[in-house]
Amino acid sequence: MNILRRGRLGSNVKEDVMKFTTSLEFDKEIFESDILCDIAHTTMLVEQNVISEENGKKIIAELKKIAKRGMENLDLDPSLDDIHMVIESELIKELGEDVAGRMHTGRSRNDEVATDLRLSLRKKVLEIIGHLITMEKNMLTVSDAHKETLTVGYTHLQQAQPVTFGHQILSHVSAIERDISRFFDTYNRINISPLGCGAMATTGFNLNRKRTKDLLGFYGIIENSMDGVSSRDFIVETMANISMLGTNLSKICEELVVFSSAEFNTIEIANEYTSTSSIMPQKKNPDVAEITRAKLSTLNGELVTVLTIMKALPNTYNRDLQEISPHLWKSVYTLIDSIQMVDGMISTVKVNKERMKENAEKNYSTATELADTLVRECGIAFRMAHGIVGELVKRSIEEKVEIKEIISEVLEKNNLSLSQEKIDTALDPFENVKLRNVIGGPAPEEVERAISSFNEKISAHKDKLDEKISEIKTAEKNLLE
């Protein structure tokens, strides 16, 4: 029976209502966190002389036993609503209500669940960062191997300018760097304690909120009790980060799908990430990239769902907030799985260097450098050079001739001239790449410098990650031993 109902509401509750309102199905994500929260709160109650040391020791010892048993071995009676009441009921079975019933002194499930969510989510955020660091390192390995692999870059999915495949990979590394920074920033806002806020107005008991903050390894406390129990912006922020990262990863999936097609044929996805057709024996379909792309798209929907649940809720706690959790955890696991899939596909991709080079040498990808050369060598305005090269491209297409066959004629018409060496250099795709040696450019030397810079950032990220993981492990060890 739900021990909460025997007073105000009575023991009768409809079974379909119990099943409809229980959160036990997804409370598995906060089970361990709830035990930690209980131990920290009980420890503080003893230190503040709110409950006796004897009772506190009994409660904590039993909580540790429950933790070792695991949630799956508890009586998950849906009439108990949630994991908080399941654990308290287990305590009461073993210790009696006069002892176990003291654990919840000065606390509400409102501040309890808010604390649990933060404890669980901070670990998941660090797990995500760890996967991103691994993927980024692997991508840098691919980039380094292809810093001189000529290919063509696209705008509007139309061939634009020559780059290297290594430079193209770095474009995704650069985006992931920002994703990592966002998650680290969000971690600091997750890792603050609402414990002690009570239902919404704190408590008349002499609690020490700073002590539970320290015991649980939080960086600080939420100082307004109403905000402490009702705020879920840390979840929205995390899910927004997840959605943004998902969008960045979906671009990689799109490139894997498009560039592995026969029409592009610049890369080949490893067999283990593809499938064949049930009817067409020749097919090699990029199924994993496609499914990952689709799963990543659902992250946007999960974010919007949570925002919609939260919109215009009255202050402070409302049971609506319970329905946020399944969307949060689904997003987290979808993202982690997707990161691993993208990492695997990028790490094992086969590159068709000849096809990449062939693409870079056609369709006028060197036109911009030819215009730039006219500006540098002839001293004309770029807009004039742009028009001259545009005319060259137009005539080349219409007359089905190479630019180098008509360039002297067009330049002479405009009272300009270029040496054959300058023309050849301007029209050479790899010379184009080497010329672009500014910060962020595709020149092999610059790509090599960028790889080194990103590796330094990864090292700093890893140190920061290890430090935060160590902080959490220390707090958990101190509470559970």
Curated annotation (Swiss-Prot):
Which Gene Ontology terms of cellular component type are present? cytosol
Provide the gene name from the record: argH
Family statement = Belongs to the lyase 1 family. Argininosuccinate lyase subfamily.
Q: Which GO terms describe its molecular function?
A: argininosuccinate lyase activity
NCBIfam families reported for this sequence: argH
Q: Which UniProt keywords apply?
A: Amino-acid biosynthesis, Arginine biosynthesis, Cytoplasm, Lyase
What name goes with this protein? Argininosuccinate lyase
Origin: domain of life: Archaea
State the Gene Ontology BP annotations: arginine biosynthetic process via ornithine; L-arginine biosynthetic process
Q: Where is the signal peptide?
A: none
Q: Which reaction does it catalyse?
A: 2-(N(omega)-L-arginino)succinate = fumarate + L-arginine
- Give the pathway annotation: Amino-acid biosynthesis; L-arginine biosynthesis; L-arginine from L-ornithine and carbamoyl phosphate: step 3/3
Where found? Cytoplasm
Might you give the EC number(s) for this enzyme? 4.3.2.1
Which Pfam families did the record assign? ASL_C2 (PF14698), Lyase_1 (PF00206)
Q: Sorted alphabetically, which SUPFAM superfamilies does this protein's record hold?
A: L-aspartase-like
Q: Which PANTHER family match?
A: ARGININOSUCCINATE LYASE (PTHR43814:SF1)
